[in-house]
Amino acid sequence: MTKYIFVTGGVVSSIGKGIVAASLGRLLKNRGLKVTIQKFDPYINIDPGTMSPYQHGEVYVTDDGAETDLDLGHYERFIDINLNKYSNVTTGKIYSEVLRKERKGEYLGATVQVIPHITDALKEKIKRAASTTDSDVIITEVGGTVGDIESLPFLEALRQMKADVGSENVMYIHTTLLPYLKAAGEMKTKPTQHSVKELRGLGIQPNMLVIRTEEPVEQGIKNKLAQFCDVNSEAVIESRDVEHLYQIPLNLQAQSMDQIVCDHLKLNAPQADMTEWSAMVDKVMNLRKTTKIALVGKYVELPDAYLSVVEALKHSGYANDTAIDLKWVNANDVTVENAADLLGDADGIIVPGGFGQRGTEGKIQAIRYARENDVPMLGICLGMQLTCVEFARHVLNMEGANSFELEPSTKYPIIDIMRDQIDIEDMGGTLRLGLYPCKLKPGSKAAMAYNNQEVVQRRHRHRYEFNNKFRSEFEAAGFVFSGVSPDNRLVEIVELKEKKFFVAAQYHPELQSRPNRPEELYTAFVTAAIKNSN
């Protein structure tokens, strides 16, 4: 029988529910249990694919092409699993499906209501996420906080699950903030008490509290919370601020969180062996070297827009016993005149993806600076496309060369819309999304990065591609197409072989990087940057 764990939040949002859920997932996986995890987002968008990065941070893409919340990146990195489209559910997605069924007459003339139709659809998503992965345990995080009007159908569905599958198969974990008032010199439990009261008013009694705090929590505070919130005192778990996120699973294990969960759900599983994870954390805390990487992006005011990129750089740094000193460079600020001033102290330059015209000329100048000064450079998605545009302009002398996306009237459309995208009108969910194979060119830097594999599978999110009409001219000038689709039609990786490291990929390698298993192309880039700093 599948076990269901529901993680809710109270007092404030962005409290770290996703990290707690991911950390618990890691502990349970290391007990030998098969774990999956999902995120409920109460917003009305179908998915975050068309949302501004300033509003939502990065869009995380799964193997099967779902555009999802960035928390799924935390889930995959912590638990080291590949999630699917059932791992992110939004209000918009649920209502869209229910309304589509109503139009088809599948409700046989019934009045369609929040209860039972919306709640049934939500419960079906929970069960489907578990069944498609054949999991022993599914962890479901509900975005936002208890009391948000948008969350009510989600919480009602969670309440009903207890009756549907039995109380012994369901556990509710509530995460809250425990504020410390310096003036009073004490922690205040009242916000948590009121949050739990609100949750209980909706029919959910939490079995465990996870309290986010900056300071150590005395046992007396835990006992008080246990008494007023009707949970066992040992089930009041402290989640204190840490230097590195990857410390959190170890901190939770030290408080027997996973054992309490297993006892409640009657899961007979051995103790979690966290030896490898602990060794990784110890290494992360004691890195001996540092290298500076300039990230040239258009959303640098919000680092969450590049969360997976940053994590992938860190992972590759760990593999090299090196801390990444990240320099955020706003692409709008980069010009041919000041590129050296902005980028001259960087050991490596990364140009990540993005959409729209703003900042693209600055990215092109950053790529030009890297090429002309032989600074290790990694381009991702739009960064790859602009790498091709930069080469066309400044090496092939194609004045005004551009991407058709950015300048439809350009004489040299180096990047063009994919053929199967031409007649698509909707923006959401219509990109080339998910896992696709990439055939590597033997002897190339890309092939060497991937240990001379013939084919790698990586995740994509794009609508435009390199225009093959220009391929022969590029190759004649020494531009190497080192990765292509198996049918040789779509360019996946480009590089300049004579440079220290000048490689750009159409796909998003960062989405498959893990702290104990860094992505190979990122590692090759970081290794080149480290060598460049010596």
Curated annotation (Swiss-Prot):
Mg(2+) binds at D71, E141. ATP binds at S14, I15, G16, K17, G18, I19, D71, R240, D241, V242. GO terms for cellular component: cytosol. Residues 1-267 are annotated as: Amidoligase domain. It comes from the Bacteria. InterPro entries: Class_I_gatase-like, CTP_synthase, CTP_synthase_N, GATASE, GATase1_CTP_Synthase, P-loop_NTPase. Catalyzes the ATP-dependent amination of UTP to CTP with either L-glutamine or ammonia as the source of nitrogen. Regulates intracellular CTP levels through interactions with the four ribonucleotide triphosphates. PANTHER family: CTP SYNTHASE, CTP SYNTHASE-RELATED. This is CTP synthase.
